[in-house]
């Protein structure tokens, strides 16, 4: 396994003379990940150059044939060894997630647990969805694509790329992984776990870097596919790039402007807690986070909103290392925090009513307080995903209007209803257009034993999680006759000698 961009100096060893750059050589571009709660560097190292990206793809190509011919049981064995290696590194990996991404320790530990749990789920999914099967005289088998690229996001720097990498390797592909530039240390530790699990060299290549490194990987002519989790803007750019190469598989898992409808719940406390977790987990940086809160106009809706605001004000926000532990850490960077606050300012300028303003809690960091704006009177609301702890409230006169508002988006990732009436949920489930629809459950709760993906501009109909096996291989249908014989009947005009 190769780690392009690995900082040798981080090992505390002197550089060998052959690796000391001469004064005449151009400087190697470097980048750093920063702790979003403090602004301090966590990891510093070189970004992979286009030549290094090409070399990584070439190594993955060379490793593909032997890896794809490795018995499936042996690949499963390596995957299970990887799960054990993650458990051994659980604390170190969670610490890296907290420092690079800002997740509280409880949340970072949960992510590592989810990474390890992905192994058995992927093995089960592959067995169910990619097993050879027969139908009459035909048999269908599944083959890996070849070399696939995986682009990882920052919000789940371990879990989400893992959700592509594990099923891809299990199917027999080799992978070139470009992690988020915000979480290179998490990627290094994950790659080390794969190495300790016995993954052969070249089967997983890691190329560190930001936009230029990613662009070099996208432009590689020797890729057979790319699996991406991230913003809709980047996803649309990738779709355009891949439009002229239909022979390459492209799986896009994008964001959403997700609606959560709260409709006359009897238990205001439970409804408010579910809404808080839907809107503000991971500082509002989960792609399934609620962005729009839809409630009935009138006293009952007002009562819920009042209770919700009281609860939101009590949330503990802070650095992951603080004691007692916070519910919510920072957004990924000070720049990201500025973007959330700029979006809030723009909505206020259009007529939104501030019910709970999101504020910067510490200069030059990503620490923000949760926000809630009433945008009912804003007629020109942008259909955009605000990636942070800012929720927009919309009051509607009836449930028909709630359904219409829920569908008023070009996205379609997640949607939820909090209500006691099962008949309302039956309507919601059947009429709202989204790939993930929850009832009396936080939007940020998804099952690895089910598909994960959206419609509209939230993806390209390549759901991940339990259905990731589908885009990690392709079917080959064969009609096979072991003994060559003359057909019993021949078409008219065809007479054998």
Q: Predicted segment positions?
A:
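Residue-level signal for inorganic ion chemistry
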Residues: 39, 75, 97, 172, ...
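ALDH superfamily catalytic-core signature
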Residues: 234-377, 439, 488, 495-496
